[in-house]
């Protein structure tokens, strides 16, 4: 177990306040017709180095999480980000977010949604740019 139970109360949900609420949002977005093996959500884990977390002020930490969530919403659309949970009970704080991989034409396609290596590299660069002001 990596989580420190004493710090679990410091965790919080900024999108969907419960698993049931998040699943309800997923169901609302899903197309009626879909493959049985379709990926329903893609998880993003967003964090910084342990050293940064030790030096960052509470304000910088809050801004990191806000900017991370904003990056996801700008890239994929606010409606597709169905859950975002800040975990502060582990050695390195992080945001765990779930995004429904809908294509522009309303299909579920994680492959098309995520893209290939070059698109993933581009995503890493644009994300890095979004948190650069925080010294990252």
Regions found by a protein language model. Name each.
Residues 1-136:
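N-terminal nicking endonuclease/strand-transfer module with a His-rich metal-binding environment
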